[in-house]
From Swiss-Prot:
Function: Monooxygenase involved in the biosynthesis of limonoids triterpene natural products such as azadirachtin, an antifeedant widely used as bioinsecticide, and possessing many medicinal applications including anti-tumoral, anti-malarial, anti-rheumatic, antibacterial, anti-inflammatory, anti-pyretic and diuretic effects. Catalyzes the formation of (1S,3bR,4R,5aR,9aR,9bR,11aS)-1-(1-hydroxy-4-oxobutan-2-yl)-3b,6,6,9a,11a-pentamethyl-7-oxo-1H,2H,3bH,4H,5H,5aH,6H,7H,9aH,9bH,10H,11H,11aH-cyclopenta[a]phenanthren-4-yl acetate.
The name this protein goes by in its record: Cytochrome P450 family 716 subfamily AD polypeptide 4
Keywords: Iron, Membrane, Metal-binding, Oxidoreductase, Transmembrane, Transmembrane helix
InterPro entries the UniProt entry points to: Cyt_P450, Cyt_P450_CS, Cyt_P450_E_grp-I, Cyt_P450_sf
Binding-site residues, heme: 425
A GO BP annotation: sterol metabolic process
PANTHER family: BETA-AMYRIN 28-OXIDASE, CYTOCHROME P450 26
Length: 478
């Protein structure tokens, strides 16, 4: 009994201090509805994985949005307590609060694979490098130059992998194409042996973004780490040779990111950290080649399933071809005329955006829609929350490129295939450019049909055609 009263007083004191000093703005805010604890978190994870394999993540989101009748919910995803935002307003809120309430977040696998290059250079050098990358892929004058180079690469690719073939599997050769384009513009890599050495290693890197970070022989993560190191070594060698070519042999060409960065830094008297630059180039390459190749697969699938839409695309491209002499490269003004082809691209991105979305981390406790999002929790915006939601897109499961040429207004932030805010995809215009050029050349030469009529797109976890999309080709020049 002697200890009872002091114990009660101690407990009361602790509770008083807790409620007295608890942050006022969130003290009454509940967590979003959902499940993050055992054993229900296991069911959440497996349900997400199952729906991803059938390319129906939108159903995972819709079921919880409807169940809780909210614009957000909490769940356990990739080992994290995570809040899913389910509305255009949520997308806008998140994009507008980068570096204020949230910051970009990536799974630990991603960071370990790339061995963060930013740790080796100053913040000023990080900002400078990003500006150099962005200007090369975003400025109109630079993009106009890329059209002719990309056109050359696409024509060579079609001649090598498509001409004379009765059947092709689209995914692997589309990857070869977008990889060749990316390597050409990033570092002027044209040697097919180097491309053939880099591509499998980069494929291992991309395949492991969401793998378990277990570095044992034979695991995805182990292959990704080895692949990343191999690519960095190749790029360091390329950087060293390029410096010799530019500053000792007087090379004049500078139509790639690497040469422009080296020349600009040399002009300003800045010594380049070769390892850090190689890491940045590998990271940029991983983002540049995979998603456009998946979108090419999606477009090929959608055109095979919709012959009347294919006919409109071909008619548009043949009309554009009439304005060019045989063998003459396309120019930016030609791409601006590809209005219906652009609608096909946009609709393919709506239905099957290669990236499901990205992640943010809460910098501090904050509230949204009356719910508390605690510091350190992860927040996920997803294309699946709005792209296939009938509230924002009529007949959302229907492939209907005409929806982008009608006067029906698209709700702001409901169509977000490239994200938004400070972290919007920096290469979005370049990605569209290379896909449109590919469409131009392939529809001029071929019609095609799916070898497996029921083949669909799946996510494991990256988007891909279930069997790589083999197609039978019907060339027009036979």
């Amino acid at each position: 009994m002697e200890l009872f009263l002091p114990s009660v007083l101690l407990i009361l004191t602790v509770f008083c201090f807790y409620y007295l000093f608890k942050p006022k703005q969130t003290q009454n805010a509940p967590l979003p509805p959902g499940h993050v604890h055992w054993p229900l978190k296991i069911f959440e994870t497996f349900d997400y994985m199952f729906k991803a394999k059938t390319n129906s993540i939108h159903k995972f989101i819709a079921e919880r949005r409807n169940k809780y009748n909210t614009k957000l919910f909490k769940t356990s995803h990739i080992g994290q307590n995570m809040v899913f935002l389910c509305s255009p307003e949520g997308n806008k809120f998140l994009f507008a609060n980068d570096y204020k309430l949230v910051r970009s977040w990536w799974p630990v696998t991603f960071l370990r694979v790339f061995e963060n290059a930013e740790e080796e250079i100053t913040p000023e050098q990080v900002i400078r490098a990003r500006k150099q990358f962005l200007s090369f892929f975003n400025e109109p004058e630079a993009l106009a130059k890329h059209v002719s180079i990309t056109d050359e690469v696409v024509k060579d690719h079609v001649k090598l992998f498509w001409d004379g073939s009765d059947e092709v599997t689209v995914y692997p050769i589309a990857r070869k194409l977008t990889f060749a384009i990316s390597c050409r513009l990033l570092a002027d890599i044209r040697d097919r042996e180097i491309l053939d050495e880099l591509l499998p290693a980069m494929g291992d890197v991309v395949a492991a973004f969401f793998a378990l970070p277990i570095n044992l022989p034979g695991t995805k993560f182990n292959r990704a780490v080895k692949g990343s190191r191999k690519c960095r070594k190749i790029f360091v060698d390329i950087i060293k040779q390029r410096k010799i070519d530019l500053f000792e042999k007087g090379r004049k060409e500078a139509n790639d990111v690497l040469s422009n960065i080296l020349l600009e830094n040399h002009r300003d008297g800045i010594e380049v950290n070769e390892v850090a630059l190689a890491k940045n180039l590998v990271s940029l390459l991983s983002a540049a080649f995979d998603n456009p190749s998946v979108t090419i697969v999606s477009i090929m699938k959608n055109l095979a399933e919709n012959p009347e839409i294919y006919a409109r695309v071909r008619s548009e491209q043949l009309e554009i071809a009439k304005g060019r002499a045989p063998g003459e490269n396309l120019a930016m003004e030609d791409l601006k005329k590809m209005k219906f082809s652009m609608n096909v691209l946009s609709e393919s991105l709506r239905l099957e955006a290669p990236a499901s979305g990205t992640f943010r981390e809460a910098l501090n406790d904050f509230t949204y829609e009356g719910y508390l999002i605690p510091k350190g929790w992860k927040v996920h915006w997803s294309t699946h929350a709005t792209h296939r939601n009938p509230q924002y897109f009529k007949d959302p499961e229907k492939f209907d490129p005409a929806r982008f040429e009608r006067n029906d207004p698209i709700v702001p932030y409901s169509y977000v295939p490239f994200g938004g805010g400070h972290h919007i995809c920096p290469g979005k215009d370049f990605a569209k450019l290379q896909i449109l050029i590919f469409i131009h050349h392939v529809v001029k030469k071929f019609n095609w049909e799916k070898v497996n009529p029921d083949e669909q797109m799946i996510r494991v976890p990256n988007l891909k055609a279930a069997k790589g999309l083999p197609v039978r080709l019907y060339p027009y020049n036979k």
